């Protein structure tokens, strides 16, 4: 176990149940810092970095804010193929379809060597329920810019973003957020 105080990261070698022969670390820090330090600790660059599984989708412009996608992007910046994986549900019960999507995406990356970074969004459920896997460009949506001043659970006044989403992609665009609606 060691700490890199300048960046506020710590890393501890861990054993993963069922994967005892795999070198693994638990790293604190931002997702992109964890990916970069993890690659360094491996001693040599990995063939693939998988980030996730995130609870909740990372669709369209959400990818610009996503730590899950950011970690995958960090790997791709250094020339390592990367996949970000998200479960559409915020409280997932079954990650099987995410695993299936990851497996299919890994096959796709093997078949098309030019693919460096892909983002997988899968619904919650069993792989047998999967209706297919589709490669699409990112959609475009935005959130309200208004904030409301309200008390939090401790009675402190806090600003909260208004809920809602505005889809900017056209209805017939073949983009990611249209396939999971």
Model regions and ranges:
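Short, structured loop/turn "capping" segments at alpha-beta junctions
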Residues: 46, 82-84, 111-117
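Glycine/threonine-rich flexible loop motifs
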Residues: 57-66
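Electrostatically charged, flexible surface regions
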Residues: 97-181
């Amino acid at each position: 176990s060691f700490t890199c105080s300048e960046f506020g990261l710590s890393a501890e070698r861990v054993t993963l149940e069922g994967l005892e022969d795999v070198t693994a670390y638990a790293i604190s820090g931002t997702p992109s810092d964890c990916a970069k330090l993890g690659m360094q600790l491996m001693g040599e660059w990995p063939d693939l970095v998988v980030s996730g599984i995130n609870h909740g989708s990372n669709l369209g412009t959400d990818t610009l804010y996503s730590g899950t996608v950011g970690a995958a992007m960090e790997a791709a910046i250094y020339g390592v193929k990367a996949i970000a994986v998200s479960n559409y549900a915020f409280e997932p019960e079954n990650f099987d379809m995410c695993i299936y999507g990851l497996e299919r995406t890994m096959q796709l990356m093997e078949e098309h060597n030019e693919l460096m970074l892909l983002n997988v969004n899968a619904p919650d459920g069993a792989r047998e329920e999967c209706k297919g896997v589709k490669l699409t460009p990112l959609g475009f949506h935005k959130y309200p810019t208004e904030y409301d001043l309200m008390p939090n659970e401790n009675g402190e006044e806090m600003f909260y973003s208004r809920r809602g989403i505005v889809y900017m992609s056209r209805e017939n665009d073949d983009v990611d957020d249209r396939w999971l609606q």
